[in-house]
Protein backbone atom coordinates (compact mmCIF):
# COMPACT_ATOMS: atom_id res chain seq x y z
CA UNK A 1 0.00 0.00 0.00
CA UNK A 2 1.21 3.47 -0.80
CA UNK A 3 1.17 6.51 1.46
CA UNK A 4 -1.42 8.07 -0.86
CA UNK A 5 -3.67 5.00 -0.50
CA UNK A 6 -3.36 5.11 3.30
CA UNK A 7 -4.14 8.84 3.32
CA UNK A 8 -7.16 8.28 1.07
CA UNK A 9 -8.41 5.50 3.34
CA UNK A 10 -7.98 7.63 6.43
CA UNK A 11 -9.92 10.39 4.68
CA UNK A 12 -12.83 7.95 4.25
CA UNK A 13 -12.55 6.94 7.90
CA UNK A 14 -12.74 10.64 8.85
CA UNK A 15 -15.64 11.33 6.48
CA UNK A 16 -17.56 8.58 8.28
CA UNK A 17 -17.32 10.66 11.44
CA UNK A 18 -14.49 8.85 13.20
CA UNK A 19 -12.21 10.70 15.61
CA UNK A 20 -8.43 10.73 15.25
CA UNK A 21 -8.22 7.98 17.89
CA UNK A 22 -10.80 5.85 16.08
CA UNK A 23 -8.97 6.34 12.79
CA UNK A 24 -5.77 5.12 14.47
CA UNK A 25 -7.63 2.06 15.80
CA UNK A 26 -9.02 1.19 12.37
CA UNK A 27 -6.14 2.02 10.01
CA UNK A 28 -3.85 -0.90 10.84
CA UNK A 29 -6.41 -3.71 10.66
CA UNK A 30 -8.10 -2.28 7.56
CA UNK A 31 -4.78 -1.73 5.78
CA UNK A 32 -3.71 -5.28 6.59
CA UNK A 33 -6.99 -6.65 5.18
CA UNK A 34 -6.56 -4.55 2.04
CA UNK A 35 -3.01 -5.82 1.60
CA UNK A 36 -3.92 -9.47 2.16
CA UNK A 37 -6.88 -9.33 -0.24
CA UNK A 38 -5.03 -7.21 -2.79
CA UNK A 39 -7.69 -4.50 -2.62
CA UNK A 40 -7.29 -0.73 -2.38
CA UNK A 41 -7.36 0.68 1.12
CA UNK A 42 -8.59 4.14 0.15
CA UNK A 43 -11.09 5.57 -2.27
CA UNK A 44 -14.79 4.92 -2.70
CA UNK A 45 -15.31 1.18 -2.29
CA UNK A 46 -11.88 0.72 -0.72
CA UNK A 47 -11.48 -1.38 2.41
CA UNK A 48 -11.59 1.66 4.71
CA UNK A 49 -14.86 2.82 3.14
CA UNK A 50 -16.44 -0.64 3.29
CA UNK A 51 -15.31 -1.21 6.88
CA UNK A 52 -16.76 2.07 8.15
CA UNK A 53 -20.09 1.26 6.52
CA UNK A 54 -20.18 -2.21 8.06
CA UNK A 55 -19.02 -1.07 11.50
CA UNK A 56 -21.59 1.73 11.50
CA UNK A 57 -24.40 -0.66 10.56
CA UNK A 58 -23.54 -2.98 13.46
CA UNK A 59 -22.54 -0.17 15.86
CA UNK A 60 -19.13 -1.79 16.36
CA UNK A 61 -16.57 0.38 18.19
CA UNK A 62 -13.26 1.16 16.51
CA UNK A 63 -11.37 -0.86 19.14
CA UNK A 64 -12.90 -3.98 17.59
CA UNK A 65 -11.56 -3.25 14.09
CA UNK A 66 -9.26 -6.28 14.20
CA UNK A 67 -12.19 -8.58 15.00
CA UNK A 68 -14.17 -7.03 12.15
CA UNK A 69 -11.33 -7.56 9.67
CA UNK A 70 -10.93 -11.14 10.91
CA UNK A 71 -14.65 -11.79 10.37
CA UNK A 72 -14.57 -10.21 6.90
CA UNK A 73 -11.42 -12.10 5.91
CA UNK A 74 -12.87 -15.41 7.12
CA UNK A 75 -16.12 -14.87 5.23
CA UNK A 76 -14.47 -13.81 1.98
CA UNK A 77 -11.85 -16.56 1.93
CA UNK A 78 -14.32 -19.32 2.80
CA UNK A 79 -17.02 -18.49 0.27
CA UNK A 80 -17.50 -17.63 -3.39
CA UNK A 81 -17.63 -13.86 -2.99
CA UNK A 82 -15.43 -10.80 -2.88
CA UNK A 83 -15.21 -8.24 -0.11
CA UNK A 84 -17.22 -5.89 -2.33
CA UNK A 85 -19.93 -8.56 -2.73
CA UNK A 86 -20.02 -9.09 1.03
CA UNK A 87 -20.17 -5.38 1.84
CA UNK A 88 -22.91 -4.82 -0.72
CA UNK A 89 -24.95 -7.72 0.70
CA UNK A 90 -24.50 -6.36 4.22
CA UNK A 91 -25.78 -2.98 3.00
CA UNK A 92 -29.05 -4.69 2.07
CA UNK A 93 -29.35 -7.27 4.87
CA UNK A 94 -27.34 -5.90 7.77
CA UNK A 95 -30.05 -3.83 9.43
CA UNK A 96 -32.60 -6.66 9.31
CA UNK A 97 -30.05 -9.18 10.54
CA UNK A 98 -28.87 -6.90 13.36
CA UNK A 99 -32.47 -6.19 14.39
CA UNK A 100 -33.09 -9.94 14.49
CA UNK A 101 -30.10 -10.35 16.82
CA UNK A 102 -27.52 -11.68 14.36
CA UNK A 103 -24.02 -10.26 14.62
CA UNK A 104 -21.60 -9.48 11.79
CA UNK A 105 -19.97 -12.92 11.81
CA UNK A 106 -23.34 -14.71 11.56
CA UNK A 107 -24.52 -12.36 8.83
CA UNK A 108 -21.31 -12.78 6.85
CA UNK A 109 -21.54 -16.57 7.14
CA UNK A 110 -25.14 -16.55 5.88
CA UNK A 111 -24.13 -14.33 2.97
CA UNK A 112 -21.26 -16.72 2.27
CA UNK A 113 -23.67 -19.65 1.96
CA UNK A 114 -25.65 -17.67 -0.59
CA UNK A 115 -22.42 -16.69 -2.37
CA UNK A 116 -21.51 -20.36 -2.73
CA UNK A 117 -24.83 -20.84 -4.51
CA UNK A 118 -24.03 -17.99 -6.92
CA UNK A 119 -26.24 -15.45 -5.16
CA UNK A 120 -23.91 -12.53 -4.50
CA UNK A 121 -23.83 -8.83 -3.72
CA UNK A 122 -27.14 -7.00 -3.56
CA UNK A 123 -29.02 -10.15 -4.61
CA UNK A 124 -27.66 -12.02 -1.58
CA UNK A 125 -28.45 -9.13 0.73
CA UNK A 126 -31.98 -8.77 -0.59
CA UNK A 127 -32.63 -12.51 -0.34
CA UNK A 128 -31.33 -12.70 3.23
CA UNK A 129 -33.20 -9.58 4.35
CA UNK A 130 -36.44 -10.89 2.85
CA UNK A 131 -35.99 -14.30 4.47
CA UNK A 132 -35.46 -12.79 7.92
CA UNK A 133 -38.34 -10.33 7.51
CA UNK A 134 -40.77 -13.01 6.32
CA UNK A 135 -39.68 -15.41 9.05
CA UNK A 136 -40.21 -12.74 11.71
CA UNK A 137 -43.61 -11.81 10.27
CA UNK A 138 -44.66 -15.46 10.10
CA UNK A 139 -43.65 -16.02 13.70
CA UNK A 140 -45.32 -12.86 14.96
CA UNK A 141 -48.77 -13.00 13.37
CA UNK A 142 -50.93 -16.12 13.57
CA UNK A 143 -53.22 -14.70 10.88
CA UNK A 144 -50.47 -14.68 8.25
CA UNK A 145 -50.15 -17.43 5.66
CA UNK A 146 -46.57 -17.94 6.77
CA UNK A 147 -47.71 -18.89 10.26
CA UNK A 148 -50.13 -21.43 8.76
CA UNK A 149 -47.32 -22.83 6.64
CA UNK A 150 -45.14 -23.24 9.74
CA UNK A 151 -47.86 -25.03 11.69
CA UNK A 152 -48.60 -27.30 8.72
CA UNK A 153 -44.96 -28.40 8.94
CA UNK A 154 -45.39 -29.14 12.64
CA UNK A 155 -43.39 -26.06 13.66
CA UNK A 156 -44.32 -23.35 16.13
CA UNK A 157 -42.81 -19.95 16.93
CA UNK A 158 -41.16 -21.44 20.04
CA UNK A 159 -39.05 -23.64 17.75
CA UNK A 160 -37.24 -20.56 16.46
CA UNK A 161 -36.40 -18.67 19.65
CA UNK A 162 -33.83 -19.32 22.37
CA UNK A 163 -34.45 -18.98 26.11
CA UNK A 164 -33.80 -15.21 25.95
CA UNK A 165 -36.38 -14.71 23.20
CA UNK A 166 -33.86 -14.21 20.37
CA UNK A 167 -34.10 -15.92 17.00
CA UNK A 168 -31.91 -19.01 16.97
CA UNK A 169 -28.84 -19.23 14.71
CA UNK A 170 -29.57 -19.46 11.00
CA UNK A 171 -28.02 -22.90 10.63
CA UNK A 172 -30.51 -24.14 13.25
CA UNK A 173 -33.38 -22.39 11.43
CA UNK A 174 -32.36 -24.16 8.21
CA UNK A 175 -32.05 -27.48 10.07
CA UNK A 176 -35.53 -27.13 11.58
CA UNK A 177 -37.03 -26.50 8.16
CA UNK A 178 -35.04 -29.36 6.67
CA UNK A 179 -36.19 -31.81 9.34
CA UNK A 180 -39.80 -30.66 9.03
CA UNK A 181 -39.76 -31.17 5.27
CA UNK A 182 -38.41 -34.73 5.48
Regions found by a protein language model. Give the residues of each.
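Conserved catalytic-loop aspartate of Hanks-type protein kinases
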Residues: 128
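Extended, hydrophobic alpha-helical segments in both membrane/secreted and soluble proteins
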Residues: 106-110
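Soluble extramembrane regions of membrane proteins in the secretory/endomembrane system
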Residues: 164-165, 169-172, 176
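Amphipathic alpha-helical coiled-coil/leucine-zipper-like oligomerization segments
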Residues: 30, 72, 174-177
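Active-site substrate-binding loop specific to GH73 endo-beta-N-acetylglucosaminidase modules
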Residues: 147-152
Amino acid sequence: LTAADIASGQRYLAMAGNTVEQIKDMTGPAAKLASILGQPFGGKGGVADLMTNIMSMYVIPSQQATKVTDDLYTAVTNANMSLTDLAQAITYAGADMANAGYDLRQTAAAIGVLGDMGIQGSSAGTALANMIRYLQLSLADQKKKGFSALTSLGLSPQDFFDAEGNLIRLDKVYRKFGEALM
